[in-house]
């Protein structure tokens, strides 16, 4: 029984933290002069809290694992909602495919060049060079 209560507490705490970040993001989105979705701002708040280790990651891990496990199911309503615009999508199918292809190509090129830049060969300079007597 004690183990079950502990598990329930972990899930409750994790979902509460995620929803508090979401609500804070939505409130901040209303105050900002630029249009950024509150859910994105909430994710950024959660990211900052986790990276600065203000919030321990084990506190949100149970709910994150649960949400990731059922992520595909969470996208079903969005897919059904897109079908309302079937006629418009069929009319614009060509430009949609071309823009997806070009944007994917651009992302792949940027990642490739960035990776080559980050992982380029660097000269290793030793702190002291040995002299003839030390060899």
Swiss-Prot record:
InterPro entries: LrgA/CidA, Uncharacterised_UPF0299. The lineage of its organism: Bacteria, Pseudomonadati, Pseudomonadota, Gammaproteobacteria, Enterobacterales. NCBIfam families: PRK01821.1. Its main location: membrane. This is UPF0299 membrane protein YPO1514/y2654/YP_1404. Pfam families: LrgA. GO terms for cellular component: plasma membrane. It is found in: Cell inner membrane. Keywords: Cell inner membrane, Cell membrane, Membrane, Transmembrane, Transmembrane helix. The chain crosses the membrane at residues 4-24, 30-50, 66-86, 93-113. It comes from Yersinia pestis. It is a multi-pass membrane protein. The keyword Membrane applies. Belongs to the UPF0299 family.
């Amino acid at each position: 029984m004690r183990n079950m209560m502990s598990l329930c507490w972990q899930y409750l705490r994790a979902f509460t933290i995620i929803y508090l970040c979401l609500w804070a993001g939505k409130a901040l989105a209303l105050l900002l002069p630029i249009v950024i979705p509150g859910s994105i701002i909430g994710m950024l708040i959660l990211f900052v809290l986790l990276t600065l280790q203000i919030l321990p990651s084990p506190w949100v891990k149970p709910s994150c694992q649960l949400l990731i496990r059922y992520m595909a199911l969470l996208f079903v309503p969005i897919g059904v909602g897109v079908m309302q615009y079937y006629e418009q999508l069929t009319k614009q199918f060509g430009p949609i495919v071309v823009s997806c292809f070009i944007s994917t190509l651009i992302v792949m090129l940027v990642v490739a060049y960035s990776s080559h830049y980050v992982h380029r060969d660097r000269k290793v300079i030793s702190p002291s060079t040995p002299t003839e007597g030390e060899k």
